[in-house]
Amino acid sequence: GTPVSQGVVPGRFGNRHSPSAAYAVFTPLFTLKGGIQGGQFWDGRASDLAAQARGPFLNPVEMNNTTRGQVIGKIQISPFEGGYAVLFDQVCGPNAFAPESVDRSYVCMSEAIAAFEGTTLFRPFTSKFDAVQAGRASFTAQEQNGLDLFTGNAKCAHCHTVNGGGGQPVLFTDFKFHNIGLPENRRVFQLVGTPFTDLGLGGFLNDPRQNGKFKNPHLRNVGLTPPFMHNGVLSSLKQVVHFYNTRDVLPKCDPALGNLDPGFGVTCWAAPEIPGTMDSSFLGDLRLTDAEEDAIVAFMLTLTDGSM
């Protein structure tokens, strides 16, 4: 597979790994108060699910529509059985397809998508972890060791919190933004046709202090969503854990090759894309054994829905 997704135009790729829509309904609104957190997309630029849903339709590397009217026009001629256009007009009308209604209908469409993404189809909580929490299952010794490391020496829970708080379910994220020192992904450069620097939150806020920071993702169903990180630079959960464990221990890869170096993730790590704002306070030299890395991966796989 590729580290980023191809849109409707063959050969045209996005520049970030697609985040999951599952459990996105629990992401709080984007806020600057009390520490920057929340919002949709990797950089938080959409305040909520409806705002996020309005983006891909007009993105030239995703759905490649040029106007809101073009999108609503496609809904009007939709061939879905049962008369989708009639249903849309009932929900978003009156006169949802009239030219003067385009903006209202476009927003209504996005709110409908957001409502769908808020249903239990997108937040079933049917993982082994949930079954253990409910007393209906038990972890294996390896999985339990992984959880103990996750909340202890591996320091994963420092950001991927295991306490939902306020009656919220456990989502394994603080919804904040971090720069963990990831390298650029030159495979993405090959797909999009040009090198670039992804400023993340700093680009959205036009604030150099936030350059290279991306929203901390939840870990529900994380075993189903490789590759990993905002640019897909890490190919497996094992490689993710190994990066956190050895980022500051392994030597740097050949700078001419970056993550294309054959030793990437094994004998070296490529240099961070944006080192100036990198968080080096609690990761990079965790001194975990190979077996302990495997245990953390085993625990994270218990977060997959339908595994019980």
What are these regions (language model features)?
Residues 1-50, 125-256:
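Short glycine/threonine-rich turn/loop motifs
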Residues 9-89, 96-118, 223, 230-239, ...:
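Periplasmic c-type cytochrome electron-transfer domains
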Residues 26, 33, 67, 89-91, ...:
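Aromatic-enriched hydrophobic runs in primary sequence
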Residues 59-62, 122-123, 193, 213-217, ...:
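Short amphipathic alpha-helical segments, especially helix-boundary/capping motifs
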Residues 60, 69-144, 148, 161-172, ...:
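Post-cleavage N-terminal segment of exported redox proteins
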Residues 218-308:
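Extracellular low-complexity, Gly/Ser/Thr-rich intrinsically disordered linkers
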